[in-house]
Amino acid sequence: MISMGMTSKGQNVDGAPAGNSSSEWIISSSSSPFQANKRYSLDPPFGSDYSPPASPQNELDPLSSYFLNLQSEDNDVRKTAIEYIINTLSNPDNEKLIKNHLPMIVVLSTESPFDDISEAFTNFLKPIQEKYHIPKQRTTVFTSESQLPPLNTDDELTRKLFQDVFLQHGRVNHLTRILGWHPQYLEKFLLAYNTIMRDPGPLPLHWRNYIGILAAARYKCSYIIALQEHEFLMNNGDARWLQGIDHIPAKLKNLLKVIELLAHQPWLLPKLDIEYLVKGTDAWSIAELVHAMVLICTFLSLSGFVFCCGISPECGLSESNNLSSSFSLNDSDCEIEDTAATENTAKVMELLKNRRSQQQDDDDDDQLHDRQQDFHNAGDDSQSSNNNTTTTTTTTTTTTTTTNTNTTSNSAGGGDSSSSTLSQSSDRMSDFSRYIGNNTMTHTDFDVSSKLYNIFSAQEYSWREHGYELVSRYFPDAAPLLDEEFSFVYTMTYYKFNNNTDIDTLPFRRAVWYYVQRVKGMLHDDYNYQEVNMFLSRSLKNFVKKAVCFPETIKRDDYSKLGYSLKPDEKCHLSLLAVCSHKQASLLYGLYSVMNYQNRR
């Protein structure tokens, strides 16, 4: 349960991976929120004169071992720990202990799947809530708590997964809670995530966390950054690295260009000669580089998902839990009305019902269409058949110069809005710049007619035929789990569309998947790109594009006005389709670059 540090095997004294050997892997450790480092200041709503507790191994803390015992499957062990903690904190002489442990108590009251824990600490907080100005805790600012899967859910698989996560980490974080809508996917996601982040592998554990920080910073995702900074310290990472990239090893700095390209213009990565990464005194082994590519793409994807679902900061980990500093959101959980949703939903339902009978006709007519033009049109929002919003599309360009982030977000249909957004205010931009430095590239649309780069053919380099093989060669445990994750998201269906049942949503899901990869410059010869504009409304395309290109610009309006009547769990499913397709596309660009280098040697 407790992070006991790492073996030194596979690391130099400075914590860098040793040499180029992929046979020396780092042994896993796990983290607990009850080992918060004092670097994190307490959230303003609780006061500004104290910090979350230091490691529970601190002998001066009489409650440390009891808090850790809450992460026990044994009911009696938990009961004893709860009684001791509550009795100790109820002593009027122990007010300082309450202050020191308040974030932890809030977490236990709101993020535990065990009723004995959540009820005990919720009851403890009630009489002191006003005294300590404890804010209302929210999992997401887009959806009411009542619509989320309960932590003590009756669904057996979801309950087991929530309990396993709590027993390992001491909390069911907001990201996990949201994914509880889709427990079968959550199970596969956790297996893959734990493998690439915590199991033995080419890179040290704290390097994995830091690469996650660098990737999340590209999309200004403070939620992911806070989680990874915390776990970085749990894994004995050098706290100086968290001051920014000026304090990290040259070997890690060399990866910044790759991260920048994968985040914003991955189609330029094949033009980058990665020989500088694998040669010299700060060289990456191929195994380390493959692991890094998987990590980068994972955290770019996760950052997009956080913004898609409006996930709120974690108590005790973020620099501020005062939502007013990050969101301009009323307390109302009322959905923003989407006037076009009913009509568009009826249209797409009819299309889905009739699609099977039309498939043969489409196959016969394929040769009549210019596939290159269809591919181009799929990326043009103005070509969407469901023009239910007045969206201005982003102008394509043949240049590789970057565009201003604010300009990009507005041209993509975001505009100025008073709706809540997860992007940070301008006075907090420096928080991300320390992890970005001079690598200031932002999104520019892929131009299908550009002479400066090529369309990426999925037939010439695909995940199944090529990417999987490369990952399995250098990181064999990860390859099948990534494959399962991709396959499951693509095929996952409940045969429902809003309240309509027995609906085959494959054409709709397929349109989302291939639209994302079209935005990333990837062509699938065997897909009819006319389906993109047939099934996706302009506003939905706008949401999906933001999710995979500049997710920090997503607003509550974007989430609420997708052009279709979708339930929150269906919007989560839609978001997963988008970000997992993005993850696969980015990973293919990264792995293709590695293969290119190997072929040239």
From Swiss-Prot:
Residues 1-58, 355-425 are annotated as: Disordered. It is found in: Nucleus; Cytoplasm. Residues 1-11 have a biased composition (Polar residues). Keywords: Cytoplasm, Glycoprotein, Nucleus. GO terms for biological process: cellular response to diterpene; cellular response to L-leucine; cellular response to leucine starvation; negative regulation of gene expression; negative regulation of TOR signaling; negative regulation of TORC1 signaling; positive regulation of macroautophagy; regulation of response to reactive oxygen species. It comes from the Eukaryota. Glycans are attached at N20, N322, N330, N387, N388, N406, N438, N499. Gene3D superfamilies: AhpD-like (1.20.1290.10). Residues 368-379 have a biased composition (Basic and acidic residues). One of its GO terms (cellular component) is nucleus. Residues 21-32, 380-425 have a biased composition (Low complexity). Disulfide bonds: none annotated. One of its GO terms (molecular function) is oxidoreductase activity, acting on peroxide as acceptor. Belongs to the sestrin family. May function as a negative feedback regulator of TOR function. This is Sestrin homolog.
